[in-house]
Structure formats: structure tokens, C-alpha cells
Curated annotation (Swiss-Prot):
Lineage of the organism: Eukaryota, Viridiplantae, Streptophyta, Embryophyta, Tracheophyta
Start-end of Acidic residues biased regions: 314-336
PROSITE patterns: S1 (PS50126)
Functional note: Functions in the early steps of protein synthesis by forming a ternary complex with GTP and initiator tRNA. This complex binds to a 40S ribosomal subunit, followed by mRNA binding to form a 43S pre-initiation complex. Junction of the 60S ribosomal subunit to form the 80S initiation complex is preceded by hydrolysis of the GTP bound to eIF-2 and release of an eIF-2-GDP binary complex. In order for eIF-2 to recycle and catalyze another round of initiation, the GDP bound to eIF-2 must exchange with GTP by way of a reaction catalyzed by eIF-2B.
InterPro entries given in the database record: NA-bd_OB-fold, S1_domain, S1_IF2_alpha, TIF2_asu_C, TIF2_asu_middle_sf, TIF_2_asu
Protein name per the record: Eukaryotic translation initiation factor 2 subunit alpha homolog
Keyword Methyltransferase: no
PTM annotation, UniProt: Phosphorylated at Ser-56 by GCN2.
Family stated for the protein in its record: Belongs to the eIF-2-alpha family.
Gene Ontology CC entries for this record: Golgi apparatus; nucleus
S1 motif domain span: 21-92
């Protein structure tokens, strides 16, 4: 299978052409007099055409508002002439359900293709050979190779073990014989497993909620500390809850989990526990932003905001020490480095 200059171009699926009435992902390449020429991204960029009459169900006032060069989107297959290689497509006949199904399939296929191509390039193997021996058999066995790759993360032998291929050899008697051998060599298996685990091992997502927490009663700091501890106690081993001060009276509750819905549920329980505790001491909790998944950018912005507030507080500390003593708000200070700890 190995070669010095491997061919890294190959369609994603075993079928060379798509089926009629199937939604496929395309990229617009050129707009001509009669319609738009496009590349079918899942089929090694073979060419298709969308006639202007198939762009919209409504009267077309401006072609440029309906289709643009470079745009990637799902369309419906109308006709396929396999002998001539003609593929007619329609944008106006693709439904919202078709679009969603196509996008989900394409995103999975694109990830599989990226992994397969990287392995082929690394080992100097023709990409089509890798698909013939591994990729397409996994599509047949599992419905989609993506589903097989998910299993392969933890149990590669159960996925790759059953795959075989035929090779022809010349026997001792000079006759050509066909032998059935494993489809995957150890070298290919190691590279494939390494790439799949790197790209597909689930990463925990961060769930966050923003609250305001106040208690102006005597020993308000103690009551806030108790409420925070009860909030953290609502977490579990899979979803540990942490609560930190941003700036009085704003706090953030966070957890990390592989299950988004479970993480949101746990944070809501933590907020409920915190609310119950602080209200028994005539305090108040207001949810500013409910539990939701946050991105790395959101977390970076929060960290920068907290660092700025800490710096501002340090600059003001000299003035506070030299001036008149201010009224205690019962909020206390939270030791940011110690997580939920409070300095009294």
C-alpha cells in the first residue's frame, strides 16, 4: 500500500456519485450565464450545476443575494448522469430537515476524512487504499465511520479486528492464490488510534452561572460563607461545583463536565441550596445569568476582569487604610486563590 508520493485525494464515501433526492454539501466555484458551477465536497470535489431556476421558489430579483462564490451549503441532487459525469442540483428543493441532516452528516464525515488523510500523509499511503481497507468497511458496519471511531477511542481491537483484505500470492507450485489477511497493519493501527484519540476524546466543558449574593445582617460574612459551602456541596465527583467572588456582590459558580445537561442541572441545584441558606438569614440571592456552557473566550474575559478588579482593590487599599473606617456591608472578602474561602 505504501508509495513515495501518496495520492491524498479521495471521496468520503464508497459510492462515486450521490443518489438522486439526496442532500449534499457543496461549495460554489463559479457563476455562469445559466447557473452556478459547484464542487461536491463529500465526493472529491466533482462538479455539479445549479440552474438559476433551481435557486429559489420565489421570483429571483438578484442572483448575488441567493448564491455567492465560495459559499458552502447543502443542496438537493436532481439528476446524475454517471456516464457523462453530469450532476444537476437544486437549492430551492432542499428542506430545513434536509439541511440539518446533511450538515450533521458532513461534519462527521469531514472529521473522519481529516483523520484518515493525516494518517495517509504521515505513513505515505494512498488515501483511497486506506478508505478501501478501513474507512468504507466501517461505514458499512456502523452506518457511519464516525460512530466506529467513537468506539475505537476506548476499544480499537473490537472495531479494527474484524476487518480483513484479500491479497494474491504465488504459491510453491507457481499458482496464484488468494489469502485473507488483517486489513490493518500494526503501523496503521497505531497511527489511526493515536489520531482518533487526539481528535475525538471528549473534552469536559465548563458550565457557569453568575449570581449576586448579599447579606447585611449581623455576621453577614459568616452566613455568606455558609451559603457558598452549601452551594459547593451540591456538586458531585463528576460535576464538582466551585464558587468564586468577582466583585461584591457578584459571584460565579462553575463546574466542568462531559454532560452539558447534567452540569446545568447541578449548578441549578447549587444555586437553590445557596438561595435557601442565605434567605434563612434574611440575605438575598439574585441570578444575573443562569447556568450555561461557556467558551474559552468567556473564561478568559472573566479572568481578565477579576485580575483588573484585584489590581484596582490593591491600588485603593492605601487610601482605605489612611481614611475613615467605612461601614461594613456584611459581604466579606473572598480569597480568590483559595477558591471559596473567605477572609474575615
Amino acid at each position: 500500500m505504501a508509495s513515495q508520493t501518496p495520492n491524498l485525494e479521495c471521496r468520503m464515501y464508497e459510492a462515486k456519485y450521490p443518489e438522486v433526492d439526496m442532500a449534499v454539501m457543496i461549495q460554489v466555484k463559479n457563476i455562469a450565464d445559466m447557473g452556478a458551477y459547484v464542487s461536491l465536497l463529500e465526493y472529491n470535489n466533482i462538479e455539479g450545476m445549479i440552474l438559476f431556476s433551481e435557486l429559489s421558489r420565489r421570483r429571483i430579483r438578484s442572483v448575488s443575494s441567493l448564491i455567492k462564490v465560495g459559499r458552502i451549503e447543502p443542496v438537493m441532487v436532481l439528476r446524475v448522469d454517471k456516464e457523462k459525469g453530469y450532476i444537476d442540483l437544486s437549492k430551492r428543493r432542499v428542506s430545513e430537515e434536509d439541511i440539518q441532516t446533511c450538515e450533521e452528516r458532513y461534519n462527521k464525515s469531514k472529521l473522519v476524512h481529516s483523520i484518515m488523510r493525516h494518517v495517509a500523509e504521515t505513513l505515505s499511503i494512498d488515501l483511497e487504499d486506506l478508505y478501501v481497507n478501513i474507512g468504507w468497511p466501517l461505514y458499512r458496519r456502523h452506518g457511519h465511520a464516525f460512530e466506529a471511531f467513537k468506539i475505537l477511542v476506548t476499544d480499537p481491537d473490537s472495531v479494527l479486528g474484524p476487518l480483513t483484505r484479500e491479497i494474491k500470492e504465488v504459491g510453491p507450485d507457481g499458482q496464484e492464490v488468494t489469502k485473507v489477511v488483517p486489513a490493518v497493519t500494526e503501523e496503521v493501527k497505531d497511527a489511526l488510534v493515536k489520531n482518533i484519540r487526539r481528535r475525538m476524546t471528549p473534552q469536559p466543558m465548563k458550565i457557569r452561572a453568575d449570581i449576586e449574593l448579599k447579606c447585611f445582617q449581623f455576621d453577614g460574612v459568616v452566613h455568606i460563607k455558609e451559603a457558598m459551602k452549601n452551594a459547593e456541596a451540591a456538586g458531585n465527583e463528576d460535576c464538582p461545583v466551585k464558587i468564586k467572588l468577582v466583585a461584591p456582590p457578584l459571584y460565579v459558580l462553575t463546574t466542568q463536565t462531559l454532560d452539558k445537561e447534567q452540569g446545568i442541572e447541578i449548578l441549578n441545584k447549587a444555586i437553590a441550596a445557596c438561595t435557601e441558606t442565605i434567605e434563612t438569614h434574611k440575605g438575598k440571592l439574585v441570578v444575573k445569568e443562569g447556568a450555561r456552557a461557556v467558551s474559552e473566550r468567556d473564561e478568559k474575559m472573566l479572568t481578565e476582569h477579576m485580575a483588573k478588579l484585584r489590581l484596582d482593590n490593591e491600588e485603593m487599599s492605601g487610601d482605605e487604610d489612611s481614611g475613615d473606617e467605612e461601614e461594613d456591608t456584611g459581604m466579606g472578602e473572598v480569597d480568590l486563590d483559595a477558591g471559596a474561602g473567605i477572609i474575615e
